[in-house]
């Protein structure tokens, strides 16, 4: 699809790595595409694409004593996306602090530019994950549809990323514990006491612990408190929520947040493969 601005044709494409869930309307919009990560559970490779079966995946993870692993899309996969016809090409990746996807996309950009040096390509390090990537992709489309030039759009979206914070509470901490993502807070997680940490992204895109509570419901209440405290400028922002197999819990979180703050819109999505691996059964992720 192309739009005419000032007499010129402008088209764009956005590649999200598959940690970023796509809404139904994004899936129907051929300007968006997903670059699949590969998940490995007990020696079995599972492609994180439209064939991903969350319930089956969660069963396999629960039954496997080893931590599931993920492998990012190859530079060649990103290069293929960047070689498609479009005036402006973008990728949105999982936080570079958590995955090699960003570096792979940068390499893919460089490969594409060797063949097409005039292409305009930018890689956005989401410094987030899951629905955080979704919101960034939607921001790109909003800016493109408003007719922004490439450099202004990149600056606008990077500032939007700066303003984002990702919050999450997990019912099941096994994956994060096993793969060392939560090494700094291992000592604080006492499963016998049902202590659930309230987690958030750092400005650099790493994971930190904000708080903890006994039981997931109390932890979710604390998470909502932190979101309400940090909600400056929320009237102009979209609230993104993703959940792993717990739609009712996500709805309760959404309603609790909307009782406290005003937002432009809300999207609620079920986690795809990579996010399901980290959120695990019962996890809720909120991005604002």
Predicted regions and their residues:
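A ubiquitous short alpha-helical element
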Residues: 93, 120-127
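Active-site cofactor/cluster-binding pocket
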Residues: 73-89, 93-115
């Amino acid at each position: 699809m192309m739009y005419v601005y000032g007499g010129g044709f402008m088209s764009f494409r956005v590649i999200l790595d598959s940690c970023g869930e796509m809404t139904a309307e994004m899936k129907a919009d051929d300007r968006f595409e997903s670059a699949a990560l590969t998940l490995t559970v007990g020696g079995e490779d599972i492609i994180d694409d439209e064939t991903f079966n969350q319930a089956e995946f969660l069963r396999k993870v629960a039954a496997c004593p080893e931590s599931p692993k993920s492998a990012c899309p190859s530079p060649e996969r990103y290069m293929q996306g960047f070689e498609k016809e479009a005036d402006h090409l973008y990728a949105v990746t999982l936080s570079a602090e958590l995955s090699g996807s960003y570096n792979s996309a940068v390499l893919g950009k460089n490969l594409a530019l060797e063949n097409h040096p005039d292409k305009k390509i930018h890689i956005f390090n989401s410094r987030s994950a899951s629905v955080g990537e979704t919101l960034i992709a939607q921001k790109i489309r909003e800016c493109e549809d408003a007719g922004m030039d490439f450099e202004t759009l990149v600056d606008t979206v990077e500032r939007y990323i700066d303003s984002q914070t990702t919050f999450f509470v997990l019912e099941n901490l096994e994956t994060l514990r096993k793969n060392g993502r939560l090494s700094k807070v291992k000592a604080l997680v006492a499963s016998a006491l049902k202590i659930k940490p309230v987690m958030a992204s750092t400005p650099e895109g790493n994971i930190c612990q904000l708080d903890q509570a006994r039981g997931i419901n109390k932890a979710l209440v604390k998470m909502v408190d932190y979101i309400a405290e940090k909600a400056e400028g929320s009237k102009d922002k979209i609230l993104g929520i993703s959940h792993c197999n717990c739609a009712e819990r996500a709805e309760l979180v959404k309603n609790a947040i909307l009782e406290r703050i005003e937002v432009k819109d809300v999207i609620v999505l079920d986690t795809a493969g990579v996010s399901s691996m980290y959120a695990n059964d019962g996890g809720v992720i909120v991005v604002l």
